[in-house]
A protein has these predicted regions:
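Charged DNA-binding/catalytic regions of mobile-element recombinases
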Residues: 1-157
Length: 157
């Protein structure tokens, strides 16, 4: 698993996305959207992750060294759910390359060059894109399947 936070400038405001990327199939398994990059946003993202995570799971969860991921509350929540924290080396964005790749693809495919009337319109478009990305957008790395199709196919095999 990997996470990070990215910023969008929309209608003279800023919108922040905090997703969880499953490195097995590149599925976004939880995310939160906020108008400020605060600890509550990260806790909301974690709540979504915990709700979907099997009790027996013991994942490694990678992030950069952002202040949210160094916060004692964040680290406590991970430990309570048997998640091992992993952090990038200082100043090395390539350590979290899968997450950076997702953000780049997201911005090229649904943000750059687009005009949104309101922040709410943008958030709706972001929700729709994440659904599309997980369920419809195919990837050659996933044998021509979407992330959800690949996960489902792998479980059936």
């Amino acid at each position: 698993l990997a996470t990070d936070i990215t910023e969008f400038k929309v209608c003279n405001d800023k919108v922040y996305l905090s997703p969880v990327l499953d490195l097995f199939n590149r599925e976004i398994i939880s995310y939160s959207i906020s108008l400020s990059p605060n600890l509550q946003q990260v806790k909301d993202m974690l709540s979504g992750l915990f709700a979907k995570m099997p009790d027996t799971a013991r994942p490694v969860f990678h992030s950069d060294q952002g202040w949210q991921y160094q916060h004692a509350e964040y680290q406590r929540l991970l430990a309570e759910h048997n998640i091992t924290q992993s952090m990038s080396r200082k100043g090395n964005c390539m350590d979290n390359g899968a997450m950076e790749n997702f953000f780049g693809r997201l911005k090229v495919e649904m943000f750059y060059g687009e005009q949104f009337e309101t922040v709410e319109d943008f958030i709706h478009a972001l929700d729709e894109y994440i659904y599309y990305y997980n369920n419809e957008r195919i990837s050659l790395k996933l044998k021509g399947m979407s992330p959800v199709q690949y996960r489902t196919h792998s479980k059936a095999s």
